UniProtKB/Swiss-Prot annotation:
Protein name (database record): Alpha-amylase/trypsin inhibitor CM1
Signal peptide: 1-25
Recorded family membership: Belongs to the protease inhibitor I6 (cereal trypsin/alpha-amylase inhibitor) family.
Organ and tissue specificity: Endosperm.
Domain of life: Eukaryota
A cellular-component GO term for this protein: extracellular region
UniProt key word Signal: yes
Complexes and interactors: Subunit of the tetrameric inhibitor.
Subcellular location(s) per record: Secreted
InterPro entries referenced in this protein's UniProt entry, alphabetically: Allergen/soft/tryp_amyl_inhib (IPR006106), Allergen/tryp_amyl_inhib_CS (IPR006105), Bifun_inhib/LTP/seed_sf (IPR036312), Bifunc_inhib/LTP/seed_store (IPR016140)
Additional remark text: CM proteins would be involved in the cooking quality of pasta.
Chief localization: secreted
Organism in which the protein naturally occurs: Triticum aestivum (Wheat)
Length: 145
């Protein structure tokens, strides 16, 4: 029969291993400039404007060359972000409702920012870029901030 004194160190070791495992599983930081580019998903602006308002913001014809379409460029940026940081990249891209200047998205003639924000929230989903996120699925929670 095990004594109390031999169980306590074993329990302590188990707890410490669990805490260490949880700490290492939290992944990288996801801040603009630290874990994310300074302007996350800047390349998605064209795709979002095209899909929400049918306009081009680049001032030139939109490429239809495979691998170089606005969607392709946007999805590549999302794919290049670490899985752990993709939702945070979308959060930075759409900005906060309380601070309109925090968004990469801009009000454009005939294309207000709100429809762009609504569309950008689904960029990670299977109907668009289909990239896995921190949730191990192609979706992000809590983007209505």
């Amino acid at each position: 029969m095990a004594s109390k004194s031999s169980i306590s160190p074993l329990l302590l070791a188990t707890v410490l291993v669990s805490v260490f495992a949880a700490a290492t599983a939290t992944g990288p930081y996801c801040y603009a400039g630290m874990g994310l580019p300074i302007n996350p998903l800047e390349g998605c602006r064209e795709y979002v404007a095209q899909q929400t308002c049918g306009i081009s913001i680049s001032g030139s014809a939109v490429s239809t060359e495979p691998g170089n379409t606005p969607r392709d460029r946007c999805c590549k940026e999302l794919y290049d972000a670490s899985q752990h940081c993709r939702c945070e990249a979308v959060r930075y891209f759409i900005g906060r409702r309380s601070d309109p200047n925090s968004s990469v998205l801009k009000d454009l003639p005939g294309c207000p920012r709100e429809p762009q924000r609504d569309f950008a929230k689904v960029l990670v989903t299977s109907g668009h870029c289909n990239v896995m996120t921190v949730h191990n699925a192609p979706y992000c929670l809590g983007l209505d901030i």
